[in-house]
């Protein structure tokens, strides 16, 4: 059985895109669970097969392709497949954005090497499309692996929208190390968050929680959260300030 040590890249590897790593994951760890979402899961072999099948259905190159970034395995299959087909992924939070945002992409010249166009939330004005290159995705992933310790046996719970860099940036390192993603639909149902940590995957869990979600867990489920302390490798936070009091409570939960 191959381990995470076997997975370490050498100077002979020339993997330039997330999908290059996904293909390697499927070859090295075909039966490892890649993604879990509700009652559905898929291995790296199954994921890669779905991605290549979907990629074959695209007959364009270099085009911006919009899709609704629902919290599903199919969403990530579509995301990877768009890249694999040589097109640019435009994940949108809801279908109503299609006409407005796609008008913006049609007016733009998309340089070679662009993987995604991600739209900002518009908190400082109108929503803007930001181009993300394949090389940026890989660099982002490598930085997170080095700084936060993403590894092959880690399961990362994603609870945010897959149209947002905050969630997609956690997909990147997990694919590079051949770990597992667990997708849940937000944090409105705390039980789903804990059910994700009850899933029968090897290793430990990590997640990203905005400060409001941390406050919710500490207020309504601190004792329950403490029961999982030995299974949680780290909790990343950001997007807003977190109080010193909440940070201390989280550390000692």
Please report, for each region that a protein language model flagged, where it lies by residue.
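ATP-dependent adenylate-forming carboxylate-activation enzymes
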Residues: 8, 50, 69-70, 90-102, ...
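Conserved AMP-binding/adenylate-forming core of the ANL superfamily
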Residues: 11-14, 18-19, 23, 31-59, ...
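Conserved pre-ATP/AMP-binding loop-to-beta segment of ANL
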Residues: 13-16, 30, 105-119, 126, ...
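Hydrophobic alpha-helical segments in the ANL/AMP-binding
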Residues: 23, 73-91, 144-146, 165-177
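Adenylate-forming
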Residues: 70, 201-249
